[in-house]
């Protein structure tokens, strides 16, 4: 390719996370040369137009199908409720669009596999947007783990506790609610980031609400060589000190609150920081400016012809969702 043309984005969903993604993407130093928010789609034309006006998108659609049919759009960000993730991902892939879909892609590995296999068949990029993996400090964490500076790593701990069970989409079974898919997935991805393999054994416990969706969980992942990960997450407690630690025989890495979207990380001999700038539209979630990194990563993958991310690729989706499947089985979580 002679030059890197602008990547035209279609945005499905005009809610909080889509706002944060668009606002964060616009903070990229090369935004105007590499990215363009071309179209917004929502469940109503009015809502789509209001969102489009905020981000100066030239097109607003009251139907997601219109995004699929728009020939100007090369990539689609899916930021709707996750009960729609598989359907819309398949729709956009069928239309020949690359896809960045908010997590969780689906409640089961088999449903995730259906989407990934179709993306491979269509020779298109598909990213499940576990945004943690695209933060520069997560690269630094992986490099430090692989360097040997920590010695033999034998323990990983994470905690993610915030009072969110009053949120409608999380407390209802028909909306595939629960905290495992919402915040527990961040704890799981962190352990997988460190160890890079499936655990040999999983021990999980959690409590379900009256509708049968999970409100909290404690999970132990047991790996070969007596290595372990201890994961704690809850949607019904007061906010905790939501940190993560990697412990080795020679040293440790500490990631302060919020470990899934950290502003900084304390390595064995230095502290590294991310740039998390404010965007043109106020953010709704912690450190949402970091969403800029997944947008930038998608651009680089597409323009270099890579269809599987080295930071969070198909093997990572498989590993994490197979662990989710086993945890769901053990705690009695069924959709």
Task: Locate the predicted segments by residue.
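Contiguous beta-strand/loop segments that form the cofactor/metal-binding neighborhood of enzyme cores
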Residues: 3, 189-262, 290, 296-306
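C-terminal helix-rich "cap/oligomerization" subdomain common to oxidoreductases
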Residues: 1-6, 75-77, 224, 297-335
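Active-site loop of classical SDR/Rossmann-like NAD(P)-dependent oxidoreductases
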Residues: 43, 282-296, 312
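Beta-loop-alpha module in the N-terminal Rossmann-like domain of NAD(P)-dependent dehydrogenases
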Residues: 55-118
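Rossmann-fold dehydrogenase core element
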Residues: 114-131, 151-156
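Hydrophobic residues in well-ordered beta-strands that form the structural core
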Residues: 61, 101, 126-128, 157, ...
